Amino acid sequence: MRRGELWFAATPGGDRPVLVLTRDPVADRIGAVVVVALTRTRRGLVSELELTAVENRVPSDCVVNFDNIHTLPRTAFRRRITRLSPARLHEACQTLRASTGC
């Protein structure tokens, strides 16, 4: 499991796609991983990063919703979908900064 990968995972709201944020050296060794949820609901917020099915190899056009960051146990991860390109991962990190104000 690596930062920038998209996975289907069991979440409290049901199975959904998530983006892994936990840094690489740690993600394979700890029991819980920091993730952010993907959704098809777009609100045009600074806390959203748009992904398209064609460019980002996701099942459908969606946004990464950085207002929905949480941890999931490693056992919750069901199936790897894809991995963001380095450029898109950089944009994700910028969106995280913008959404948290850090």
Swiss-Prot record:
GO MF annotation terms: DNA binding; RNA endonuclease activity
Keyword annotations from UniProtKB, A to Z: Endonuclease, Hydrolase, Nuclease, Toxin-antitoxin system
EC number from the UniProt entry: 3.1.-.-
One Pfam family linked to the record: PemK_toxin
GO biological process, alphabetically ordered: mRNA catabolic process; rRNA catabolic process
PANTHER family on file: ENDORIBONUCLEASE MAZF, ENDORIBONUCLEASE MAZF-RELATED
Family: Belongs to the PemK/MazF family.
Record function comment: Toxic component of a type II toxin-antitoxin (TA) system. Acts as an endoribonuclease. Neutralized by coexpression with cognate antitoxin MazE2.
Subunit text: Forms a complex with cognate antitoxin MazE2.
Protein name (Swiss-Prot/TrEMBL): Probable endoribonuclease MazF2
Organism (species): Mycobacterium tuberculosis (strain CDC 1551 / Oshkosh)
Encoding gene per record: mazF2
